[in-house]
Amino acid sequence: MAGLMSRLRAARGGDGPSGAQLHSEAGRAALFDTALSKLYKTIDQMQTKRVHLFNPIKTAEEQLQQIYLVLEAEEASIHDGMTGACLQYLLTSQRLHNIAKGLLGDQPLGARLVWLSFILQVLSHLKHPLLIHAEVLEALNSTIKVLRRDQRRLALAEANIYMQLLLRLTEYLERNPSCLPLFLEEKPQPAFPLLAALMPFVQHHTDEGKLARKAVVTCCQLANHSQQLEQFLLRHEIFAAEVAGALAGAYSNLPMSLPARSRKALKAWAYGAKAFSHRVPRAAHYFNALTFCGQVVRAVPSSVRGLILDQVYHGFMLSVLLPSLHHRAPEEAVAAMNYLRISLSRTRNTPLQGAFLRLLLASQFEGCWTLDRLVERLETLGEQSLTALSLFQALIRLHNEDVLLRLCLRFVHRPLARAAAAASRPPYPGTLMPADSGCNSEPESDIGTGTSTNTGAANHTGAGTDTSTSVHADKSNRVQLQGGTHPNGSSDVSAFALHNALEMRAGRKLLQLVPAQTAISPSERTFEGYLHAASQGVDAACAACATWRLSYLQLRPHQWLGKEDLDIDAATVNDNASAVSRCESEGLFLATLSRLTRRMLEHNLATNLLLSSIVSMLASLPVPALRNYLLDLNSPSIEGISFVEQLHALREDCLRLLAEDEGLEANLHAYRAGAEGYSRPKHRVKAPSTTAPASPARGPLATFHSSRRSRDRAASIVALPPHSAANEPGGVSTSAPTPASRASDADGASRRDARPEEPTIDDEAATTSNGGFDDGTSEQDSDSVCSSYSGSSSHRASAVSASHPSTRLTAAALATLDQERPPLPSPALGATTDTAPSVSAVGDEIKDSKRRALKVLIVQEFVKELAACAMEQSLLAVAM
């Protein structure tokens, strides 16, 4: 009560009433009547515009504050659920409505702010359910109607309190959904004034915009409890169009190309959304709009979600985002791919991610598929290639089946799966297995050579069996089957024979998996008839799979699959593998990835890090065919030099540089001695093992952290020495930071202190847009490279996933290599783009040698950790 008395005394500008007046009902009524009479008199003077010597705004504010304090004291003195006499008097005879009408006029300035502050204070602090009273609802509707009309002329303080009032109303409706029909209008046409008042402020990049976005999301959640509001959102598409328009407008305001200073500071593979927005201020507005759109899509009912996603896809992605991704200018392409990469991370595990994937997988621009255009940029030069690699790294990290199927799985799974099945089946002539024949009705006419050797059957005949005789018998049997005669002398190919063959092969398990409508009918008496029935079954299965796989894309299956007849002349695993080309191409992405791995010696270190990260993530998937394609030296799908062989080549190049320059190792020791601040003896000594730097820097390659024994075993497999820097010709300790890095950190800290205030991303974005993923950090830390689809394999993989210390070493070295300096004399290591920093502690006469020494150190660490990563992935996948 003492606090209430002091506030009342301050509001009156003098001594407050006595305690007896506030404790008694009669005293509160007298104070309330006096304040209300003075308020009416002040409003009358403002409306008639009489000449007066006092400030009417200040007087009205004092009287409203006194009324509120009396109402608060009255509520504290009565029981819960009861209405006091003063509040009951205020809610009758339209007294509250008349006060609102008098203070919502244009003149004098500040009257609206006084009324908004009073009504917000009453609704926020009084426990009585005021919204159930018609007087309060009428006053609120009048306030919303007037301020909607004059929203462009609102002062900043008025707009802020107005948004707080609307947010308070939405939160009250969320707690009491039964009051929602009171805010819905049916005549003259259906309307929801509360939502209509919020939408114009959604695109504001101020605190008012943040409050408006939060209130709109709350309104969308109310639609789950009100069928009337859900039908309103379905009938009025203007809401979905405004959500898509806000996103398109924010993206259109982004710079089409990153500034030169930002391009030098921004490494597309190392920064998240918050770090990006610090260097590109307008990016924060786009990320806020993207987060808001994702929150709305998740909050609305499922019936409204499809409408909003369709508007976003056509109104933003196809019309704005798609043309920017197909820009020919390198600077604009780099900016668009950076925006897309961070957008994918911001919308992870949300329905909006499906719309982005639909754009990448199923959209064309000027006759070119979007995904193919992005794959083509992998082989470009400079930042465009690095940004494209980082984008595909983010795509693969999503572990989306549609993306992986489009990129690689559909090109490697089918041929190698056929080969594995052919190697494990029994001899063909003894049983009838049309399902394993590869749908090849003419084995004697092979593609390219015109000859056929049944290697699959010959492998099971034994060492003393004549292969040519077995192949000839197999051909004759298949020819008899085409003519409708069984090799054992039967007159036809009956369903009984097929049943026996399948029963012998799968022990009735396969028959239990075959649907009834796809069972082979006894009327199919020829092999051609079986092929025709099997073709129809395959088409039906493909259509069903496409409907399931592309359901969130909202596409019809025939738009994706097309209508292709079954090719019965295709090559099979029984044909000559050396003379017949592969059944399917390896695909544009895998072909490009293969070419990039063959040229690892020509790339810079950053490109090799991103490339090796993509290869490691693909090799960690539980798909043996893909792992063999990427890592197995004896895989038939690999042409040319493999990825593992490139690791050996990089290793040999490092050793060659050390052997060519006799003083290189000594200069390396001198460089490290100058960096660590102590003198190293001139004679050769073994350096301590490589340790992680103290700072928790995040590297661009998320690799596996395994034990010393497992890493040594992995290194021995690829004929590399263990992970001890003492065993390296130039191995050194990396425990202390370099002077250049300390100077760079100090310079960066001073620049951060001097930087003006910039737009920030909404606080709720990190927790609501992607399930607790904070975009201020590198996206590498949120995902494990070895995560897979199955629960058991995911459990095994999670036990060994972490950021390796040498990865952080590589990241720190990359930061120093990015400084301006002359090129290195070693083109084999990509020296045209990566150079080393100058060290003031050492003389200018050995700078070139020190640069080469630092380059060798980084590549050595890269090769060792990458080899361990690749081989640990292979061993882990085999254990699965």
UniProtKB/Swiss-Prot annotation:
Pfam family, one: DUF5917
Composition skew (Low complexity), residue ranges: 448-467, 687-697, 733-743, 783-805
Segments for region (Disordered): 437-471, 677-805
Biased composition (Basic and acidic residues): 744-758
Family membership noted in the UniProt record: Belongs to the FHIP family.
Protein's UniProt name: FHIP family protein 36947
Species for this entry: Monosiga brevicollis (Choanoflagellate)
Lineage: Eukaryota, Choanoflagellata, Craspedida, Salpingoecidae, Monosiga
